[in-house]
Amino acid sequence: MASIRELHQQLINKERSAVEITTEALERIAAIEPQVKSFLCITADRALETAKAVDQKIAAKEEIGLLAGIPIGIKDNMSTKGIPTTCGSRILENFIPPYESTVTQKLQEIGAVMVGKTNLDEFAMGSSTENSGYQVTANPWDLERVPGGSSGGSAAAVAAEECVVALGSDTGGSIRQPASLCGVVGLKPTYGLVSRFGLVAYGSSLDQIGPFGRTVEDVAIVLGAIAGYDAKDSTSLKLPIPDYTTFLNPSLKGVKIGIIEETFGEGLDSIVAETVNKAIEQLQALGATIERISCPRFRYGLPAYYIIAPSEASANLARYDAVKYGIREEAATLLEMYNKTRAKGFGSEVKRRIMIGTYTLSAGYYDAYYLKAQKVRTLIKQDFDKAFESVDVLVCPTSPTTAFKAGEKTDDPLSMYLSDLMTIPVNLAGLPGMSIPCGFDQQGLPIGLQLVSNVLEEGKLFNVGYAYEQSTEWHKQKPPLK
């Protein structure tokens, strides 16, 4: 499937119609879905309706934006009016939202074609998409392996060319880690840059919506479309949004890059370390100056996150009581109905995180756990602040390993949590981070390089990511799907 700019050119030159592009995407989904299972819901009627409207605009010689007529997948934790939004949970099995999320509304208004809602770990809690209450998504590079998570459906859909781009959400690495495992580009923007209105909350101080694409330019285009102030989101930043494509510079002359020392230690696969080091050498060859940077509190990100995120989740998920929507288990009393509904509706990982969160917020433990974790969070942010005094962009592996086999870590939550070791501190500090493909292991599984910049400096990520991408061929590789 071509890039956004290539498809846009074909549309305005009338070489292809939006309906033809959409039909091709829907046919690809029909052919690939039995193997990959990226989507929970295919929105063919709405997609073709949007595509027809784009074709009518072109016929009337009206100007269209870059995303008009472009097939896009939406993670199924973003509210879509009249279309099921399950969050990958049985508790929301029959839920059809009465309102549209800000990001999907923005995309709808510019004519982007939503082809479906993608699979995810239940309520975005997980790193493999195995926690979905409906199906397990496969990694397009090896169908026996996981695509990462929690936005595994979106990453797999883009890698398998079922859509051109997709939206995911990232609370502790849920865009960047699956992007790494599926060999695509994934961006977590600065906290507050993209509206969270209509995103079903997991960890409200950490969640952020961002794009997946096969190229850095595609991701930059989508970010430009979804970013911006929204009065419906109190954490939304009131700032002008630049044209992110202006940062796509193939030269890195004058760019200072820091290698986060703490990420090259225990638990990192040797092939991942070797591949990432080669990528760093390439950045140097493109003109960047490289130095080693210490972020001493980086390693405490994981334990701090697994106190803060479950604490916020336990409060956010208290609203699922079956009174007004979702599945309901009948019972003699209201309390019994709550208990039976939540016991049946939530999966084991969600229950685990609710329990952890309830415990850490309870009297007698709040100061010892939650408050201490928030203090650690502040120290991690201070480490990043100090690092950005001397460098423009920080680099490290996105994930300590390549994709693991489905079922391999389901009985070992701690091992699963370690998948987000490199990505979590970026969320805790509210910074933008992007994963770009930088090679493959001996089994042909993708490896990602994580780029991190200071608050609201996504442009620097696009500069470094684009320069690296244009000087390599990794983004052109395609999974061996039949």
From Swiss-Prot:
PANTHER family: GLUTAMYL-TRNA(GLN) AMIDOTRANSFERASE SUBUNIT A (PTHR11895:SF151), TRANSAMIDASE (PTHR11895). The gene is gatA. Coiled coil: none annotated. This is Glutamyl-tRNA(Gln) amidotransferase subunit A. NCBIfam families: gatA. GO terms for biological process: translation. The active site is at K75 (charge relay system), S150 (charge relay system), S174 (acyl-ester intermediate). GO terms for cellular component: glutamyl-tRNA(Gln) amidotransferase complex. It comes from Rippkaea orientalis (strain PCC 8801 / RF-1). It is an enzyme of class 6 (ligase). Keywords: ATP-binding, Ligase, Nucleotide-binding, Protein biosynthesis. PROSITE patterns: AMIDASES. Heterotrimer of A, B and C subunits. Belongs to the amidase family. GatA subfamily. It holds the Pfam family Amidase. The keyword Nucleotide-binding applies.
